[in-house]
Amino acid sequence: MTSVDSQPDLSAAEAVLGAHVRDVMDFPKPGVVFKDITPLLSTPAAFGVVVGALADLARGLGATTIAGIEARGFLLAAPVADRVGAGIVPIRKQGKLPGRTRSEAYALEYGTAVLEIHEDAVPTGERVLIVDDVLATGGTAAAAHTLLRGCGADVVGLAVLMELTFLSGRDRTGTLDVTSIMKI
C-alpha cells in the first residue's frame, strides 16, 4: 500500500483540473456524462500543474515505468514519464499492437472491450505506475493491472485525474493503490 509520505499535495492540481474539465452529455452513448479534458490539454499552464502532480506521485512511489491506457491515458503518461525520467508502456485496445501480446477482456460503464500489452513490455520486477484520465467502473484499471502483473511488473499504483465515485470503480481494482486528483 502507498504510504502517506509518498502522497503529494494534490489540492492545487484538483483546483486546476476542476476549472478545466467539461461535461458532455450522452456521449458516447445516451445516459453517459463524458468528462472532457480537452480544455485542460489546451491550456499549457493548467496541464503542467496536473502533469507535475502526477510526476510527484510517480517519484514518491519510485516508479521506473509509466503505463498509459489508450487513449487519453497516453496523453498523460508520456509527459509524466518524461518528467521523472521513466520509460513508458502503452496499454492498447485490441488489435493495435504488432507482435506477441497479452490480452484481457473487461466491462466498461457502457459496454465491453479488450486491452492488450506486448508480452515483453516490462522486465520482471519493474516498478510501474498506471496512468489514466478517469476511474469509472474500474474494469479498464483492473485489466491493465492484470496485464502488467502477467508481465512480471511490480505495479505501484494507479493515478487518475478523476474518479467517478458513484460507479464504485475502486472496488474492482483489488489491491491496487488508487490516487485520484479529483473525486466526482
From Swiss-Prot:
GO cellular component labels: cytoplasm
Keywords: Cytoplasm, Glycosyltransferase, Purine salvage, Transferase
Places the protein is found: Cytoplasm
Example GO BP: adenine salvage
Reactions it catalyzes: AMP + diphosphate = 5-phospho-alpha-D-ribose 1-diphosphate + adenine
Transmembrane segments: none
Record-level Gene Ontology MF annotations: adenine binding; adenine phosphoribosyltransferase activity; AMP binding
Pathway note: Purine metabolism; AMP biosynthesis via salvage pathway; AMP from adenine: step 1/1
SUPFAM superfamilies cross-referenced by the UniProt entry: PRTase-like (SSF53271)
Disulfide bonds: none
InterPro entries according to UniProt: Ade_phspho_trans (IPR005764), PRibTrfase_dom (IPR000836), PRTase-like (IPR029057), UPRTase/APRTase (IPR050054)
Main location: cytoplasm
Family: Belongs to the purine/pyrimidine phosphoribosyltransferase family.
Functional description taken from the UniProt entry: Catalyzes a salvage reaction resulting in the formation of AMP, that is energically less costly than de novo synthesis.
Protein name per the record: Adenine phosphoribosyltransferase
Organism this protein belongs to: Parafrankia sp. (strain EAN1pec)
